[in-house]
């Protein structure tokens, strides 16, 4: 896109002779004036050669500069360099090392829904004077590819007075809205920096169990949003036998590549960008980058499309899976913070949660292990002290640990608390019950059999198929089944009540029903059958 009234120094450059137009980073730095706002390519597409020269240059004109970057990994833009008064980093992202820097006042966080960021640049609420992005060498037709991070690069290039393309031969050439003609750059700089790679996360038996429970909630033909971490590594393995999954994800990763390569994700049942995986960023190993190179099955688009809840919601059965750090008995979520976390901010999560709510058959799933690596409980009475909270706890559809699934949608606070206690670590449940009773979240007379919690026969779970493909899910009863069992009681006929309880019973309040759902597994066996959609059946 050529802006009216702007000169394009490279407009007449022969694409086949682009190397003759390459300048040194110092030449670019000379054009920067004090007080300018400089947009830097995001995350693994950070233009590290130019950034490194900016950070180390002693040029007198580099004063009071504002650096704008959606996601900063603190690689070239280090926290040490930001201690200088010459630079101030402003980011829309609260993950990775930015979380600590924001708390220390060294980085400014701009709270915003990701889908709205392009509008902030286009409306000049966040003006950009200089745009520096990393691109592939131009093709014979003169088009460079933005590679593995599209985000708002186009908007920044369209509104900047100075556009710099840092050409790196190691970037995969990707498809979608990734192309920028070489003539749109004012300067080209050569980079020999390697890409930033992420090794695959290690998983263990606990994460595998969490993933299996998450996978049980994902139907064939669902459309998925992933991030990075052990949850997603384990989940891809558990989804390998699904059919016609779709991908509409902020980040494309090695596990998503695995799902496409094994045939589980065909993208043929999606409503938007059918036949292709949709994303805006890629994070992963060199194998992923090699696979993405010139791969037409993965579509990279701007974040106002990838993060747009209305676009997301057009896909039926859209499922967003979020790795949680903590959860409390109200269903409030504490998200991850710190280095190693890419999708950490509530704003990034909320766009996809909203999209799932708009999707027919969509759902949001928050998953975590019941305890962290240090053995501390991840299910707490309250996460009020956690620094990175997801405020929309009413939008939390389900929480998953290795001990099962807590369905929260449509449930009261008391019912939520009971369901979450059921999936907490068995050694943490008695304490949670006691604290919840003290806070009047649970009934004061709530029964809890501590030893029974450790004996719960999870291996009895099975699915019974009847005529007409009608399925009944069987499992051992849980304390959180109390409300469902109470409603079932009032649907019984008098004869059914008598045959079940061997005498006439006219009512089944909490005090009575809790005795039937809190089972001593040393002496009693109680099985429930569930029909209908997971979490919404009866």
Sequence positions of predicted segments:
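Conserved alpha/beta enzyme-core scaffold
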Residues: 2-450, 485
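Long, contiguous binding/interaction regions
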Residues: 455-538
């Amino acid at each position: 896109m050529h802006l009216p009234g702007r000169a394009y120094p490279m407009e007449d450059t022969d694409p086949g002779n682009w190397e003759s137009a390459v300048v040194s980073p110092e030449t670019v730095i000379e054009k920067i004036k004090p007080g300018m706002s400089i947009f830097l390519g995001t995350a693994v597409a950070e233009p590290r050669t130019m950034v490194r020269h900016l950070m180390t240059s002693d040029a007198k004109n580099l004063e009071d500069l504002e650096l704008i970057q959606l996601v900063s990994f603190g690689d070239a833009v280090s926290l040490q360099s930001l201690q200088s008064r010459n630079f101030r980093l402003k980011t829309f992202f609260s993950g990775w090392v930015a979380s600590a820097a924001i708390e220390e006042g060294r980085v400014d966080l701009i709270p915003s829904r990701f889908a709205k960021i392009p509008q902030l640049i286009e409306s000049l609420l966040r003006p950009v004077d200089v745009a520096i992005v990393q691109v592939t060498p131009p093709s014979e037709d003169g088009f460079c590819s933005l590679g593995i991070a599209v985000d708002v690069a186009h908007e920044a290039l369209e509104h900047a007075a100075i556009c710099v393309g840092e050409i790196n031969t190691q970037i995969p050439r990707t498809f979608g809205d990734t192309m920028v003609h070489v003539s749109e750059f004012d300067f080209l700089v050569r980079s020999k920096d390697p890409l930033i790679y992420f090794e695959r996360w290690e998983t263990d038996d606990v994460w595998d169990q969490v993933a299996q429970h998450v996978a049980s909630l994902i139907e064939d033909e669902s459309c998925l949003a992933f991030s990075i971490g052990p949850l997603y590594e384990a989940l891809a393995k558990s989804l390998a036998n699904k059919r016609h999954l779709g991908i509409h994800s902020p980040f494309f990763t090695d596990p998503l590549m695995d799902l496409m390569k094994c045939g589980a994700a065909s993208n043929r049942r999606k409503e938007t960008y059918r036949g292709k995986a949709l994303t805006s960023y890629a994070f992963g190993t060199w194998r992923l980058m090699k696979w993405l190179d010139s791969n037409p099955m993965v579509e990279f688009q701007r974040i106002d499309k990838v993060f747009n809840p209305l676009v997301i919601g057009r896909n039926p059965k859209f499922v967003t899976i979020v790795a949680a750090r903590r959860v409390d008995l109200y269903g409030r979520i504490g998200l991850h913070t710190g280095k190693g976390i890419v999708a950490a901010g509530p704003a990034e999560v909320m766009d996809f949660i909203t999209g799932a709510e708009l999707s027919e058959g969509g759902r949001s799933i928050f998953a975590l292990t019941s305890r962290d690596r240090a053995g501390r409980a991840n299910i707490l009475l309250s996460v009020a002290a956690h620094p990175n909270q997801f405020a929309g706890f009413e939008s939390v559809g389900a929480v998953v640990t290795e001990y099962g699934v807590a369905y929260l949608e449509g449930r009261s606070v008391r019912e939520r608390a009971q369901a979450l206690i059921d999936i907490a670590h068995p050694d943490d449940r008695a304490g949670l019950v006691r604290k919840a009773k003290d806070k009047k979240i649970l009934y004061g007379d709530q029964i809890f059999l501590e030893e029974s919690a450790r004996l719960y026969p999870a291996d009895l779970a099975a699915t019974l198929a009847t005529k007409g493909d009608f399925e009944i899910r069987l499992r051992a009863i849980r304390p959180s089944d109390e409300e469902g069992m109470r409603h079932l009681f009032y649907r019984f006929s008098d004869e059914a009540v008598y045959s079940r309880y061997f005498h006439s019973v006219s009512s089944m309040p909490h005090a009575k029903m809790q005795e039937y759902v809190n089972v001593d597994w040393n002496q009693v066996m109680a099985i429930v059958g569930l029909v209908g959609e997971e979490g919404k059946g009866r």
